UniProtKB/Swiss-Prot annotation:
Species this chain originates from: Hyphomonas neptunium (strain ATCC 15444)
Name of the protein described by the UniProt record: Large ribosomal subunit protein uL3
UniProt keyword Signal, yes or no: no
Annotated keywords: Methylation, Ribonucleoprotein, Ribosomal protein, RNA-binding, rRNA-binding
Cellular compartments per GO CC: cytosolic large ribosomal subunit
Gene: rplC
Family: Belongs to the universal ribosomal protein uL3 family.
Length: 252
């Protein structure tokens, strides 16, 4: 059995939630994701290449794997480090606010090209990853959905307490990862198998059914679903727009 080539994911900005109406009149809750000028900033390849050292010598190196570095969002050049400015200039793209590397196994796109919204086919399933909304210190009922204790019949003060956490004299300790009160949110979360309801190539929008992690305005990673096969009408190698070289004053 030959597995299909792993395609690159994309970086998108979460705009917010709304709803659209299907052909039969049903309303579908969707999250709007904006590609926000998502471009290929660099690539990693298994091919050997010649690199010039600081002393002027030549050495042969390889990355050892295939990957695509995607960048999204605008960022002022004065707020970008000198090292990153050099990478963006080499790629011929404006400074990006967010970078992410995606492992691939197929053909590598051209550096500087822009990904289009039809990189994903309508009806296919995708996985969306992002940092969840931080909610600070939370109790066991909010954090782990505990039912809590009774409202009366001898219960006093401990209505929302998580109850006993220890065991007997053996082992005589609280196990690690015990569900207790603590910090909630602000962690990497992946929502799997979300349906792509609609794409808008002109405006660079992807509409997925349901909610995705993170607050409005955060960057999310969108990939082909790892647990579901791609549909037959999915783009073979993604849809990319040819790169446009920056002018001399394009980095301001």
């Amino acid at each position: 059995m030959t597995l299909p080539a792993a395609r690159t994911g994309v970086l998108a900005r979460k705009v917010g939630m709304t709803r659209i109406f299907a052909a039969d009149g049903r309303h579908v809750p969707v999250t709007v994701l904006s590609l926000d000028g998502c471009q290929v900033v660099g690539v990693r390849s298994e091919e050997e290449r010649s690199v010039t050292t600081k002393k002027g010598g030549q050495v042969t190196r390889t990355d050892g794997y295939k990957a695509v570095i995607m960048g999204s969002g605008d960022k002022k050049a004065k707020n970008t480090t000198k090292a990153l400015r050099g990478q963006f200039a080499k790629a011929g793209v404006a400074p990006k606010a967010k970078l992410k590397e995606f492992r691939v196994s197929g053909d590598l796109p051209e550096v500087g090209s822009t990904v289009q919204a039809d990189h994903f086919a309508e009806g296919q399933l995708v996985d969306v990853s992002a940092m969840s909304i931080g909610k600070g210190f939370a109790g066991a009922m909010k954090r782990w959905n505990f039912s809590g204790l009774r409202a009366s019949h001898g219960v006093s003060i401990s209505h929302r307490a998580h109850g006993s956490t220890g065991m007997n004299q053996d082992p005589g300790r609280v196990f690690k990862n015990k569900k207790m009160a603590g910090h909630l949110g602000d962690e990497r979360v992946t929502t799997q198998n979300l349906v792509v309801v609609r794409t808008d190539v002109e405006r660079g929008l992807i509409l997925v059914k349901g909610s995705v992690p993170g607050h409005d305005g955060t960057f999310v990673e969108v990939r082909d679903a790892v647990k579901k096969a791609l549909p037959a009408d999915a783009p073979a190698a993604g849809s990319f727009k040819a790169p446009e070289k920056l002018s001399a004053g394009g980095e301001g």
